[in-house]
Amino acid sequence: MKRIFLFLATNIAVLVVINIVLAVLGINSRGGTGSLLAYSAVVGFTGSIISLLMSKFIAKQSVGAEVIDTPRTEEEAWLLNTVEAQARQWNLKTPEVAIYHSPEPNAFATGASRNSSLIAVSTGLLDHMTRDEVEAVLAHEMAHVGNGDMVTLTLIQGVVNTFVVFLSRIIANLIARNNDGSQSQGTYFLVSMVFQILFGFLASLIVMWFSRQREYRADAGAAKLVGAPKMISALQRLKGNPVDLPEEMNAMGIAGDTRDSLLSTHPSLDNRIARLKSL
């Protein structure tokens, strides 16, 4: 629940900060509906796009991932060769491959585009899983890259953020209007922030739902690439090993929650396994 709260709080905080900065600069949302919608889009997409462009840098710094430029061990060479082979099957430029030190088995993919991406695995993943299972995990992350999930998630977040800002301003405009047609600036700003937080929470449910669907899709992509048995085996292995990632990276990891929830970024491992068995 801590991860979920921080995920929601971070997105809402970004919206609030951007609004405050624009207000300080004298850039406001007054005007017609078209102007308000344009203003809302600027606010809604700015944070998401910046996060996307900086995603590889943030990911590396968050977990201390070390990119493999020249393999130093047979295991590193195998990782590079496996990712390169999978990238060819997707007709993609080979992503950067990195390892980060963590006892928990996990992996994630990120990047600004399908041909500018990063796939990172933990030392715990390499220690706890067989080569077949690691291959399946890499295929799952490659499916995220090939499906363009990072970009799509950014666009969805930007769209919902836009409507969060737009609707909160519309309601604030109605509530803050005085009988003589004037408007209380303080009331307008306060009401818009309150509704922005409320709508931000509700909008996050949409983003979480999409995140869960993309996990099913990535599992299916991995099954197509390496076979469902390998992917099922990898997920079953994860069930016995609790995992953790920094809060800002959780949506990109492979591990899921023990139960389904509207606020989960991943479906439960049991449901993912059941979905794979039905393919």
From Swiss-Prot:
Molecular function terms, GO-annotated: metalloendopeptidase activity; zinc ion binding
Entry membrane topology: Multi-pass membrane protein
InterPro entries reported in the protein's UniProt record: HtpX_protease, Pept_M48_protease_HtpX, Peptidase_M48
GO cellular component: plasma membrane
CC cofactor note: Binds 1 zinc ion per subunit.
Positions of Zn(2+) binding: H140, H144, E215
E.C. number: 3.4.24.-
Keywords from the UniProt entry: Cell inner membrane, Cell membrane, Hydrolase, Membrane, Metal-binding, Metalloprotease, Protease, Transmembrane, Transmembrane helix, Zinc
Active site per database record: E141
Major location category of this protein: membrane
GO biological process, one term: proteolysis
UniProt-recorded name of the protein: Protease HtpX homolog
